[in-house]
């Protein structure tokens, strides 16, 4: 091997060793900094989620207080388990709720329920009309029995949509005839408030969905 070949080989080995060394060094730096960088991303995402959840609860509380209802709720649709033929079970769950003092919350029992059990409510949701519905006028079924257990006297319900598709609903419940009569007397203001609250919640949910994609 002549001197030129030796120099070329030494030069080649030098660059190989330098490249390996830099790769190891860079990997070590990334490994060391990753724990600091990753939580920051998670922290920002978690912060946004908490803000959205907090705002939704604030909107529901405002709706409950101004409409003088017992409960203001946001219920969302989702996929559940699967039937034997592979078809997904469509379900609903209460995700946010504001209740008056002394009123029992429904969050614990309104979770992972088949949407088909609430078909009469779905029909009202699709109408998209902020009207007061008397529970006594509802046809017999699971949805009526469910609300009777919660002492519901009347309710108002509106769809919550994502990309023009119904993804859940907003609901307020009155638990006494006195409160219902008061709501009827203020139906115009309550209807506007209901629509306004629904629209604000939709904006928040759309933001949350965009950030998670």
Language-model regions: role of each:
Residues 167-213:
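Juxtadomain coupling helices with adjacent low-complexity linkers
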């Amino acid at each position: 091997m002549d001197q030129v070949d030796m120099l070329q080989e030494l030069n080649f080995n030098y660059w190989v060793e330098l490249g390996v060394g830099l790769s190891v060094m860079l990997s070590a730096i990334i490994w060391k900094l990753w724990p600091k960088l990753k939580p920051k991303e998670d922290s920002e995402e978690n912060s946004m989620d908490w803000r959205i959840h907090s705002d939704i609860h604030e909107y529901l509380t405002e709706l409950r207080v101004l409409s003088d209802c017992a409960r203001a709720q946001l219920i969302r649709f989702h996929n559940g388990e699967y039937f034997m033929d592979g078809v997904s079970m469509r379900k609903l769950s209460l995700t946010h709720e504001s209740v008056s003092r002394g009123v029992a919350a429904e969050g614990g029992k309104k979770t992972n329920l088949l949407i088909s059990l609430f078909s009469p409510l779905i029909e009202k949701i699709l109408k998209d009309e902020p009207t007061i519905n008397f529970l006594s006028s509802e046809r017999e079924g699971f949805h009526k029995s469910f609300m009777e257990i919660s002492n519901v006297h009347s309710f108002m319900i509106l769809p919550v949509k994502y990309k023009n598709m119904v993804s859940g609903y907003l609901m307020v419940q009155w638990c006494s005839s006195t409160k219902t009569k008061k709501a009827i007397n203020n139906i115009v203001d309550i209807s506007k408030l209901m629509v306004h609250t629904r629209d604000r919640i939709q904006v928040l949910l759309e933001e949350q969905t965009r950030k998670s994609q």
